[in-house]
């Protein structure tokens, strides 16, 4: 989609970077333009009228003027600020994490309304749900699928035989779960029958349905190990927000 000289777009602020003494470069995920960059002049000044509308994971209608190298933010009006998330360290860390993933998995200026809607729905759920960890797992699994990295969960990703009801192995390199026989030639993380069932259920259902799941801490830990390994393999690095999330978990905050 070609941008006019002056344009408005709905956007979620997924990253902000300091620039100069008072400016910022904003990464904006939009439904119609994909990931775009915006220069926000003087937004870090205390008297800036825009600063409150351009916070991280804020959902706003943003006005921009097209530039040669980067577009300039000329106005912004908040649509949703997600106050419940902002009042909780744990929820804020999760919101930072899903925004970081959305940033890495969204190519610049290539519209992907499905990823935009997934991120928006996830932020809305985090702002209201009591099952934030499950909500985050839903986001991770569906983001991988929308980005072309859907893990194989029904058959061995290596030999393509139907998986048996036994301990199998999650292998990002192979593209999903592998059977014990293929584990002899491939690396993989042990994953239980129940954890595989939960992964399948999350992958195949909408977000309201996943709250029916009753998952213990052991299963959540298995899911976390497998999904993190998959994301790390795709990105070839660890998302920075995980450091904050893990530190909060260790402190039981």
Swiss-Prot record:
Keywords: DNA damage, DNA recombination, DNA repair. Transmembrane segments: none annotated. GO terms for cellular component: bacterial nucleoid. InterPro entries: ARFGAP/RecO, DNA_rep/recomb_RecO_N, NA-bd_OB-fold, RecO, RecO_C. PANTHER family: DNA REPAIR PROTEIN RECO. Involved in DNA repair and RecF pathway recombination. The gene is recO. Pfam families: RecO_C, RecO_N. This is DNA repair protein RecO. GO terms for biological process: DNA recombination; double-strand break repair. Belongs to the RecO family.
């Amino acid at each position: 989609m070609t941008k006019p000289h002056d344009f408005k777009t709905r956007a979620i602020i997924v990253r902000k970077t300091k620039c100069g003494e008072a400016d910022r470069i904003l990464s904006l995920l939009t439904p119609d333009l994909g990931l775009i960059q915006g220069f926000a002049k003087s937004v870090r000044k205390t008297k800036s009228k825009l600063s409150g509308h351009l916070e991280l994971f804020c959902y706003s209608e943003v006005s921009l003027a097209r530039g040669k190298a980067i577009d300039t933010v000329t106005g912004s009006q908040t649509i949703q600020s997600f106050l419940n998330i902002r009042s909780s360290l744990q929820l804020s860390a999760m919101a930072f994490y899903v925004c970081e993933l959305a940033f890495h998995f969204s190519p610049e200026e290539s519209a992907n309304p499905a990823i935009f809607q997934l991120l928006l729905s996830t932020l809305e759920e985090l702002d209201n749900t009591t099952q934030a960890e499950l909500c985050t797992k839903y986001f991770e699994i569906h983001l991988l699928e929308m980005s072309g990295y859907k893990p194989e969960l029904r058959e061995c990703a290596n030999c393509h035989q139907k998986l048996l009801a036994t301990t199998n192995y999650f292998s990002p390199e192979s593209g999903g779960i592998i059977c014990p026989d293929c584990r002899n030639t491939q690396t993989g993380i042990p994953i239980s029958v129940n954890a595989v069932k939960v992964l399948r259920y999350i992958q195949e259902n909408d977000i309201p349905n996943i709250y029916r799941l009753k998952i213990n801490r052991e299963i959540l830990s298995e899911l976390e190990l497998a999904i993190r390994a998959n994301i790390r393999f795709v990105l070839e690095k660890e998302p920075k927000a995980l450091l904050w999330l893990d530190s909060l978990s260790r402190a039981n905050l």
